[in-house]
Amino acid sequence: MAGAQVADLGRFLERMTSEPFVDGATDCILTVADWIVLSGHPDPAEPFRGRYRTALGRERIVRREGGLLAMMQRGADRASLQQTASPRPGDVGLVSMSGLELAAICLGTRWAAKGSGVVVAEPEKIIRAWRV
């Protein structure tokens, strides 16, 4: 990852930490999509951005999309992201943390996901990752 992008990631994580979790605005899915857009790619969340404001609305969209993995894969395709088996800081993925599947940003061995604040942990499993 280029030096400028490292600095941008640091600033982005600070912003992630300071903003409350809000379904349809700053949830784990849209936060990762925001990072992808900030990194210069098309918006992977464009088809559903602004279409939900509650946890129930989010769950309905995820279910309609065929699950979070299918939803993220289509978003990665829209943003022209390539799948990677060796994620680097700044890459994104679907990870399993504490038994939950979360959209997250790679920090190295740990990943950051939007919760109430930011959850930073080593995932139990990297389900799929994409190069940003």
What function would you assign to each model-found segment?
Residues 34-40, 69, 106, 110-112, ...:
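Bulky hydrophobic/aromatic packing residues
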Residues 1-62:
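N-terminal capping segments
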Residues 43-46, 86, 122:
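Intrinsic-disorder/low-complexity coil detector
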Residues 56-119:
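...with weaker cross-activation on analogous glycine-rich loops/strands in unrelated enzymes
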